[in-house]
């Protein structure tokens, strides 16, 4: 390919062809050689923005590669697509909807979309009023007791985002009139819920039914179980449901039909995708945990990234760089798995959140025009809190046969903020934070440089099974500290990274048709398992055999 390219002027060759040529040309290039050739490589391949530092110098890229990645973005009309996203255009082409999660974090004084901003803030104010009432101990259950436990019942975007943020910002939990605990339930099998209900008192427990469609069977089956639990303890009175349930949905009529009082119904819109919805009233558990000011800081951090994404050239645009590095690794270096490694235990659920954000958005094989994709799309996204991962799967990263790209994430400061709870242990905990940071830097260094990172004397007689090849690419994202504002920034960076990659691949990141059919097939099988139907003739042999075992008709 590279020989044929040389026959034509550079500007006439497509960026994709040029990138393939660069892969061939630099196929044996090692990250350590890139650093040896550029003494100021860190300065050239890092971006500082607000409370963030993004270092991408440990990727297998050169200036020529970056130039062609930017050219690829231009040929895909990325700037135009960013403008379309931040309008009310129906960029979700299969469902004929806009994708306006960015509108959920617009400041109240934002003048470009006055009606949209007013709509959003009306619902946020209703949510804030409920938060204040619960925090003050003024919201009472059916027996008049103060609410002390709130259980969020949701799944997917109604669970992963709120749970991730609530856990990540545990240091910022606000004081309330009476201690308030927030819990999350998502699994449809009932085990999670069963374990939790044993710990709760019906009189002091409030449930949030969080479902965009108010038709998700996972969520409604859990909601029905807790309704029975409440009514068994408190009686079958209208006031039980009206006092102990809050609904968050696009479907006011369905919430009313279920029995939720109008004052306890928080609304969102069909232009908010579930996995992009934590900024809306789906984020009610977040606001209950970190308070109204904290929630507003979360929104402000995301809005700052929205502005950065729209108004910054590609060369300094962090979401664009994150996306294009992913394209380079996935589509040209054939690195089809990506690990997310936060070095902070508070980000325990961040990788799981990103799995949905990235793989449900970009796990597609059909382009916007209905044709099969021309490039591989989303890689497998996985990860774990870094120090734990070191004792689980870093062996594979360092000495396995799989090429893996990584994101290392860490806060620069901890245990020195006003919200720090354990002042008496501050010195020891600061040392522990430094221990985590040193491991974060050491692991990214060893992955990149391999044996080069070792002491030369140590390397001299080192057996091959103790050696490291290196050349595994990674980015490092440093936050000044992990707080509501910086977490809002971090999440929005990944949201926009996903969008940029969808533009390059020409796919719709805002639908999830692959999820729908499995639910429909489950609806067809449920009557068989419940004994209401017994015709198995249309099923495949495997499913028939498994159903017979489940029904006890044959031995397992």
Swiss-Prot record:
GO terms for molecular function: carbohydrate derivative binding; glucose-6-phosphate isomerase activity; monosaccharide binding. It is found in: Cytoplasm. One of its GO terms (cellular component) is cytosol. InterPro entries: G6P_Isomerase (IPR001672), G6P_Isomerase_C (IPR023096), Phosphoglucose_isomerase_CS (IPR018189), SIS_dom_sf (IPR046348), SIS_PGI_1 (IPR035476), SIS_PGI_2 (IPR035482). Keywords: Cytoplasm, Gluconeogenesis, Glycolysis, Isomerase. Pathway: Carbohydrate biosynthesis; gluconeogenesis; Carbohydrate degradation; glycolysis; D-glyceraldehyde 3-phosphate and glycerone phosphate from D-glucose: step 2/4. Its EC number is 5.3.1.9. Gene3D superfamilies: 1.10.1390.10, Glucose-6-phosphate isomerase like protein, domain 1 (3.40.50.10490). It catalyses: alpha-D-glucose 6-phosphate = beta-D-fructose 6-phosphate. One of its GO terms (biological process) is gluconeogenesis. The keyword Isomerase applies. It comes from the Bacteria. The active site is at 360 (proton donor), 391, 519. PANTHER family: GLUCOSE-6-PHOSPHATE ISOMERASE. Belongs to the GPI family. Catalyzes the reversible isomerization of glucose-6-phosphate to fructose-6-phosphate. This is Glucose-6-phosphate isomerase. The gene is pgi.
